[in-house]
Curated annotation (Swiss-Prot):
Keyword Repeat on entry: yes
Lineage of origin: Eukaryota, Fungi, Dikarya, Basidiomycota, Agaricomycotina
Native source organism of the sequence: Ganoderma lucidum (Ling zhi medicinal fungus)
An example Gene Ontology CC term for this record: endoplasmic reticulum membrane
Induction of its expression: Expression is up-regulated by methyl jasmonate (MeJA).
Protein name stated in the entry: Lanosterol synthase
Family of the protein in this entry: Belongs to the terpene cyclase/mutase family.
Membrane topology field: Peripheral membrane protein
GO BP field: ergosterol biosynthetic process; triterpenoid biosynthetic process
Reactions catalysed according to its record: (S)-2,3-epoxysqualene = lanosterol
Length: 726
């Protein structure tokens, strides 16, 4: 395929493969991010690079050194002087959302099998990204900080070869050696088996059945897929279709070469059915249960005699659900995995020239992020709302939002929040098994249209803070719209008082016995999360201060029930386990904030005291905290080799929310964070900050501004008050 011709490449990705002065970030009115390479000098002259372009590309942004801060508030002010220069004209902050190393292969394989190419500059920088994240042994992990796995190495090797990496390039040679040392691609986990089968370099007989017929079951059946966690069901819809039709790339020279390169034995001699449960030990996080293996035996028997009319009806049903998802999200879809699978479904069912296929082609770029290390595939189409929600709250709680210097920036943030609120339920609300969204805020953009309980919570708090505390701020979001957001939050509480992510819990937890993915934990049904629950508690508590007459009894009942859940979720050592950030520092900060808003602090609450003592016990000699992503895997505290600024801020803020009476731990944290601030007000990037499904780390690079500014500004006032009392 001419669009994927082999490329001449340097030995490493240390230097850019393209001219970074020619990259530009374009923003749609709704906040969609797309990177563009300008090939002519006239284009470059007509579209100058912005400060945020240069920053994300790792270029010199040309901002001046600031006066050295003499206290924490001045350090926070310097931090925001830097960060506001990266606020977009739309009012939000752009940023990467990378980290997982199985996303780019889906983009590349999904595009290749659909006959959709990339610009040469995009191909070059995607290869460079892979070069820059290869491990010392030549392989790739499940995320950028993880050890090499078959999943990461086989998929990224295929992606690099498709993009134009030659088989004899030193990076390819070393990657193959790593893969073969791990046993070759036969032991790739199920999602990898699926992608390699799509590429026609792994036989479909090596996959466990993916029965699309499950979608024909009555909705009331306990294992009906609409009850699964939304990311899982939205991936297995197109998976069921593509498995059902046995979609595969036509054989060509590259496919034939990969069949030789990926395996330690002859491709045509492999016993494919014997590979179905073969998962390399280095990849295995969630082994198959005996229940799942028994189910696979039954499904295998069914697959050998599946009724063609039933299979056709099931495939048709999966196609219908794919279209509903695409229409609900304008082909951005829930995330990049189901987005690329949906694209293949639409091309297979409708043809490459169909409107659906063309829209998918355009929407690929919403997930492609250009950074200092090359071009990556993001975990969603951004984290726009998530970032602005925290920054807006930080502006108010530090007092910076009241300063004339930052007022315009705060008002632009409010305008973005106004535009970003989801004003209606999804187009296909009931038929696509969606939860209500009218009044919610998304994680990224309202076009993508999915809300998470904590995103609506943080969005609501941000609006209330800005509209009530910024001088002269207009009431852009009406009381009715704020009440709509509250309605969404109240609709999401589960029976035990906790809040899950996207929806109510629809299936029993024993469904996790049927987790087929091997590399992820807690994916089969929704689970309650302390950090989601706390975001809702704090949002409702702040809302009722300003609007005390709306659903008063419902709000009180919800908060009381949620606090009961939070007490039960506290771990014996005193912290709360974080499922979306790393890890105990993250969740414990949110928990102590919410408890404080209902009157539970260090002086009044045993739970708060235990949490504070837990955090203080983990403070390091340098004054900071450092937690490894490994804590999320093993569900216990694991020290990072280095102190982390972001986690230090979470821990210090937790202590302040709890009204911890001793200043020394907070003073030491402030000193550590200030010591790492650069002269221009910024902080360098440190270790990865986020996580999902226990085993995959993901980046939140704007956290190093949002939480540092927030903590320093709060600490300045808090410490003054503590010392005044003494």
């Amino acid at each position: 395929m001419a669009a994927y011709a082999p490329l001449e490449l340097p030995a490493s990705g240390a230097l850019p493969f393209t001219d970074y002065a020619r990259w530009r970030l374009r923003l749609s009115p709704n906040g969609d991010h797309t990177w563009h390479y300008l090939r002519t000098d006239d284009e470059v002259a007509a579209w100058p690079q912005s400060t945020y372009d240069k920053y994300w590309l790792g270029q010199d942004v040309g901002l001046p050194e600031l006066p050295p801060p003499t206290n924490a508030l001045e350090a926070a002010r310097n931090g925001y002087r830097f960060f506001q220069k990266h606020q977009t004209e739309r009012g939000h902050w752009a940023g990467e959302y990378g980290g997982p190393m199985f996303l780019l292969p889906g983009l590349v394989i999904g595009s290749y099998v659909c006959g959709m190419g990339f610009k040469t500059e995009e191909r070059l920088e995607m290869i460079r990204y892979l070069f820059n994240h290869v491990n010392e042994d030549g392989g790739w992990g499940i995320h950028i900080e993880g050890p090499s796995t078959v999943f990461g190495t086989a998929l990224n090797y295929c992606a690099a070869r498709i993009l134009g990496l030659k088989a004899d390039h030193p990076v390819a040679v070393k990657a193959r050696a790593c893969l073969h040392k791990l046993g070759g691609a036969v032991g790739i986990p199920s999602w990898g088996k699926f992608w390699l089968s799509i590429l026609n370099v792994y036989d479909w007989e090596g996959n466990h059945p993916i029965p699309s017929e499950l979608w024909l079951l009555p909705d009331w059946v306990p294992i009906h897929p609409h009850r699964w966690w939304i990311h899982t069901r939205n991936v297995y819809i197109p998976m069921g279709y593509l498995y059902g039709v046995r979609f595969k790339m036509e054989e060509n020279e590259l496919v034939s070469s990969l069949r030789q390169e990926l395996y330690t034995t002859n491709y045509y001699s492999i016993d494919w059915p014997a590979q179905r449960s073969n998962v390399a030990a280095v990849d295995l996080y969630t082994p198959h249960s005996a229940v799942l293996e028994g189910l696979y035996t039954l499904l295998g028997a069914y697959e050998s005699c599946a009724l063609p009319p039933l299979r056709r009806a099931a495939i048709r049903r999966c196609y219908e659900l794919v279209v509903l998802e695409d229409e609900n999200t304008d082909c951005q879809d829930l995330g990049p995995v189901n987005k690329m699978m949906n694209q293949i479904v639409r091309v297979h069912a409708e043809g490459r020239e169909s409107a659906g296929a063309k829209r998918h082609l355009e929407r690929r770029h919403d997930f492609m992020w250009m950074g200092a290390e090359g071009m990556m595939m993001c975990g969603t189409n951004g984290s726009q709302l998530w970032d602005i929600g925290f920054m807006a709250q930080a502006l108010i709680e530090t007092g910076l939002g009241a300063e004339d210097e930052f007022r315009e920036s705060a008002l632009r943030a409010l305008q973005w929040l106004d535009n970003c609120q989801i004003r209606e339920n999804p187009k296909h609300y009931r038929t696509a098994y969606r939860h209500q969204t009218k009044g919610a805020w998304p994680f990224s953009t309202k076009t993508q249209g999915y809300t998470v309980s904590d995103c609506t919570g943080e969005g609501l708090k941000a609006v209330l803070y800005l509209q009530e505390h910024v001088k002269g701020a207009p009431k852009l979001i009406s009381e009715r719209r704020l009440c709509d957001a509250v309605d969404v939050l109240l609709s999401l509480q589960n029976t035990d008082g906790g809040f899950a992510s996207y929806e109510l819990i629809r299936a029993p937890q024993w469904m996790e016995w049927l987790n087929p993915a091997e590399v992820f934990g807690n994916i089969m049904t929704e689970f309650n999360y302390p950090e989601c629950t706390t975001s809702v508690i704090t949002a409702l508590a702040i809302f009722r201060k300003h609007y005390p007459h709306y659903r008063t009894a419902d709000i009180q009942r919800t908060i009381t029930h949620a606090v009961d859940y939070l007490h039960k979720a506290q771990r014996p050592e005193g912290g709360w386990f974080g499922s979306w950030g790393i890890c105990f520092t993250y969740a414990t900060q949110f928990a102590l904030e919410s408890l404080a808003l209902v009157g539970e602090t260090y002086e009044t609450s045993a739970a708060s005291r235990r949490a504070c003592e837990f955090l203080v016990s983990k403070q390091r000699a340098d004054g900071g905290w450092g937690e490894s992503y490994k804590a999320c895997e093993v569900i216990e505290w694991v020290e990072h080799k280095d102190t982390q600024v972001v986690q230090t801020c979470w821990a210090a803020m937790a202590l302040m929310y709890a009204k911890y009476p001793h200043p020394e731990p907070i003073e030491r944290a402030v000193k550590l964070v200030m010591s790492r601030q650069r002269p221009d007000g910024s902080w360098p990037q440190e270790a990865i900050e986020g996580v999902f499904n226990k085993n995959v780390a993901i980046s939140y690079p704007n956290f190093k501004f949002e939480f540092t500014i927030w903590m320093l500004g709060r600490a300045h006032r808090y410490l003054k008050e503590l010392h005044a009392k003494k």
